Structure formats: C-alpha cells, structure tokens
Swiss-Prot record:
GO biological process: L-histidine biosynthetic process; methionine biosynthetic process; purine nucleotide biosynthetic process; tetrahydrofolate interconversion
InterPro entries: Aminoacid_DH-like_N_sf (IPR046346), NAD(P)-bd_dom_sf (IPR036291), THF_DH/CycHdrlase (IPR000672), THF_DH/CycHdrlase_cat_dom (IPR020630), THF_DH/CycHdrlase_CS (IPR020867), THF_DH/CycHdrlase_NAD-bd_dom (IPR020631)
Top-level taxonomy: Bacteria, Bacillati, Bacillota, Bacilli, Bacillales
Pathway annotation from the record: One-carbon metabolism; tetrahydrofolate interconversion
Record keywords: Amino-acid biosynthesis, Histidine biosynthesis, Hydrolase, Methionine biosynthesis, Multifunctional enzyme, NADP, One-carbon metabolism, Oxidoreductase, Purine biosynthesis
HAMAP family: THF_DHG_CYH
The reaction(s) this protein catalyses: (6R)-5,10-methylene-5,6,7,8-tetrahydrofolate + NADP(+) = (6R)-5,10-methenyltetrahydrofolate + NADPH; (6R)-5,10-methenyltetrahydrofolate + H2O = (6R)-10-formyltetrahydrofolate + H(+)
Family the UniProt entry places it in: Belongs to the tetrahydrofolate dehydrogenase/cyclohydrolase family.
GO CC, any one term: cytosol
Species in which this protein is naturally found: Lysinibacillus sphaericus (strain C3-41)
UniProt protein name: Bifunctional protein FolD
Length: 284
C-alpha cells in the first residue's frame, strides 16, 4: 500500500486563504502589509525564489518591494540599505536572500535587521527567543513543517523525531520546535556513524541534508512519518528531494513529495510572519 501524501500545496493554500483574510482586515484599518526583499548579485536560483515570493505577496494583496544590488556591493552599503528599511513605516518584514556574495558576512547582515521585521526568524534575538519558547518569528521552513504535521493530524508528543541535518536554517530550529511539542529529538548529520541505526528509530524522520535521494528504505522504519525538506536535481536534472521517494513510498505511513511538499509551506509561512509583523505594528 502507498504512503499517505502530505500535500503542501493544499495545506499551504488553506493557510494563505486565512492570511489573505487578515490582509483585508488590516487594509480596512488603513495598513497594507509590506515585505522588502534584498537580493545581492546574480544567483539565478535566488532570483527565482525572490520572484515567487513577490508573486505570492501580490496574490494575497500585500505590498512587496525588491531591492536588487550588484554582486560587488560593499558590506557597509548593504547594512545602510537594511538600516533604511528598518526605519520605513510601510515595510513590516525584511528578508535578505541568502547566500550572499563571499565578501559579505551573513551573520552581521542578519543581525542588522530590526527584530520586529525579522520575518525569516534568523537573527540572534529571534533564535534566542525561539530557544526559550518565547513568542517570536519562527524560521519559515521549520515553521512550515510544523504546520504540515498539525494539519495532517500527526501526533508529535511522545514521539521520537530524528533530524538528518544540522543547518541553522532548518535542522537546528526544527529540533527545537519539535522539542517544544514534547517530541524526543535526535540530531544526526554527515559525521554520524551508521546513520540507519538512528533513523530507523524515528517515528518522525526529517530529511534536511541537501543530497539527492540520500534517504533510502534502509533508513526508514515501517509506519514512520517522513518529511523531505530537500530540493535537489538528480543525475537526469529532475527535481527531487533528499528522500528516495520510490523506495520509501509504502514503508512510511505519511510522506511529503518533492515538489509540492515542504516547498510551498516556506513561502506561506513567510507571508504569515509578515502579516503578523504588520498586526504587531498596529497593536503597538
């Protein structure tokens, strides 16, 4: 029997519809949520992501602005640009598209974003608050995964969640959010010996390793929930995840496809966070 598909497009659309309602209510009070996206250089993948983000904003009635800077932009110039956005009343969320050119320090740039506009949830203050379980903007991909689990009716409390990957953007925050919902969490990564001996214990397996079809049937126990965060190209240049879907389908109880699983949720939660930032502004 095939695994149940967790459909990120459908769940994402349901959340977007609710967010669009919130945008209407804000506009009735004279406030249009605004997102500024800063893109440095000519990375084609980044440019595509940014276009998708802008389209998604416009689709729900939000304002979005692209600040496109050349590859050779100095770090000081970028920081000045962010400080100007921090001051602007019409911008409620600021997102700096990563990766940045090598000569720019990402940590310094992210730390410059005003915490009340840090809709990516990457700044040291946002991360610290998340670790403490305080209210803050959550990183969009892990936040999206939590929503997928919630909307699919998957129990987290008391379950063993194993995460493959330890990036600041997905792996580390993912574990924290699961821990806050009373999962027992194990982190694994590229240096973990005998990876299947860990992943085979997972009730919920999160693959966020950035390697095409890396997780096979050897890694998954019968009935596990498998969440595939990866977006890769295989040898035939076909879009695929970190999980070998064909092998794991039928072993997992639930699985996210690539595309159409976690991907749509990342942008959805960015919209969610930006509208939340606008609502916070109005409340204050």
């Amino acid at each position: 029997m095939s695994s149940a598909i967790i459909n990120g497009k459908e769940i994402g659309q349901e959340i977007r519809n609710a967010v669009a309602e919130r945008v209407i209510r804000l506009k009735e009070q004279g406030l249009t949520p605004g997102l500024a996206v800063v893109l440095v250089g000519d990375n084609q993948a980044s440019a595509t992501y940014v276009r998708n983000k802008q389209k998604s904003c416009e689709a729900i009635g939000m304002y979005s602005e692209l600040i496109k800077l050349p590859e050779e932009t100095k770090q000081e110039e970028l920081l000045t640009q962010i400080q100007q956005l921090n001051q602007r009343e019409d911008i409620h969320g600021i997102l700096v598209q990563l990766p940045l050119p090598k000569h720019i320090d990402e940590d310094t740039v992210i730390a410059t974003i005003a915490v009340e506009k840090d809709v990516d949830g990457f700044s040291p203050v946002s991360v610290g608050k998340m670790m403490l379980g305080q209210e803050t903007f959550l990183p969009c991909t892990p936040f999206g995964v939590m929503k997928l689990l919630e909307y699919s009716g998957i129990e987290i409390a008391g379950k063993h969640a194993v995460i493959v990957g330890r990036s600041h953007i997905v792996g580390k925050p993912m574990g924290q959010l699961l821990l806050q919902k009373d999962a027992t969490v194990t982190y694994t990564h590229s240096k973990t010996p005998d990876l299947p001996s860990f992943t085979k214990q997972a009730d919920i397996l999160i693959a966020a390793v950035g390697r095409a079809n890396f997780i096979t049937k050897e890694h998954v126990k019968e009935g596990a929930v498998v969440i595939d965060v990866g977006i890769n190209r295989d040898d035939n240049n076909k879009l695929c995840g970190d999980v070998n879907f064909a092998e794991v389908d039928g072993i997992a109880s639930h699985i996210t496809p690539v595309p159409g699983g976690v991907g749509p949720m990342t942008i959805t939660m960015l919209l969610f966070n930006t509208v939340q930032a606008a609502e916070n502004k109005l409340a204050n």
